[in-house]
Amino acid sequence: SLDDVLGGVLVEPVRGTGLSWFLQERGELRHLRAYAVQRSLYHLKEADPHTWVLPRLSGRAKAGMAAVQYDEYGAGRAERLHARLFADLMADLGLDATYGRYLDEGCAPMLVLVNLMSVFGL
């Protein structure tokens, strides 16, 4: 069944093995800062490419996507924009939150992700 196939993917293990677990359990400030630098390439613009899909959707799909985007854009409150929240995190870590500031430090997988999201949005 579909539940059996997806069951293992949808349940987080008690002891994680991913990056978030590493940062929580063993990570140092330098690790968090390096992670934020990489993620800044995506998170400082995160909702914009997704919004480009709205004109291509209709009905329930469009309404659902618009609801997600409403949250991404802070539910109408500028201080709650997800990109703003990430910029605040970067500032708290002593990092420059200017979009694209760390482009030259971006690793290949992150650059692929950012470019792919923009291409799919177009």
Locate the predicted segments by residue.
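Non-heme di-metal
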Residues: S1-L122
